[in-house]
């Protein structure tokens, strides 16, 4: 169990994956030993997120970047939700088990938010306006999307007016639209605020309260 806060210099490691500008993204947590004779060690958590750089010289060498405030805020919000529920107040530090699969998944989400490239949602989403009640969200909120492959979960990671970017928590089979086979977990999708539905829609268990079906 480790206590993490904004004072710890979390790092991203971008490791060249190909000569075409793609880099694999890993999280690095530096640990300094209090014993001067003990060698300091870093903890590295690999993710499935791929970053693309149009600057070929940058993509040819490993690069280390510090987490920014957006990274840390999203991480703390998602960890707090995981540990205490949706109505927990914002915190400045958390104690986490970095071997916990749920925490590792949160790290994937934060990496995707910072380095992923968003797909357009044209042809992937079904129209929900007037059929299902919209779900008011802010950054770090969970939502459901009504897709050609059923309701799928996502985390809101960017908002600009009506435009929203979500990190997918479920894969979407999109063979029917002909461009590619599927969108994977932790891919980014650009949607509209009116596309965001209550996350309970994606559980398949119950219909959210106040949901109207026509």
Positions of PLM-derived features:
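Internal alpha/beta domain cores that form substrate/cofactor-binding pockets in large enzymes
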Residues: 191
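Short beta-strand-centered aromatic/proline hotspots
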Residues: 150-167
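Mixed-charge, low-complexity intrinsically disordered regions
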Residues: 1-151, 171-185, 194-214
């Amino acid at each position: 169990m480790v206590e993490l806060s904004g004072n710890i210099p979390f790092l991203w490691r971008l490791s060249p994956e190909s000569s075409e500008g793609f880099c694999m993204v890993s999280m690095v947590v530096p640990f300094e030993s209090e014993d001067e004779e003990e060698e300091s060690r870093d903890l590295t958590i690999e993710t499935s997120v791929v970053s693309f750089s149009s600057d070929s010289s940058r993509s040819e060498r490993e690069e280390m970047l510090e987490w920014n405030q957006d990274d840390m805020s999203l991480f703390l919000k998602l960890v707090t939700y995981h540990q205490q529920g949706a109505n927990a107040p914002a915190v400045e530090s958390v104690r986490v088990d970095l071997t916990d699969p749920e925490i590792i998944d949160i790290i994937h989400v934060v990496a995707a938010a910072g380095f992923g490239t968003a797909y357009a949602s044209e042809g992937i989403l079904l129209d929900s306006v007037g059929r299902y009640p919209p779900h008011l969200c802010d950054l770090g909120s969970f939502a459901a999307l009504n897709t050609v492959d059923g309701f799928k979960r996502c985390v809101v990671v960017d908002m600009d007016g009506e435009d929203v970017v979500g990190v997918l928590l479920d894969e979407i089979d999109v063979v029917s639209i002909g461009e590619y086979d599927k969108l994977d977990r932790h891919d980014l999708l650009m949607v509209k605020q009116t596309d965001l539905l209550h996350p309970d829609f994606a559980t398949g268990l119950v219909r959210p309260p106040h949901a109207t079906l026509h």
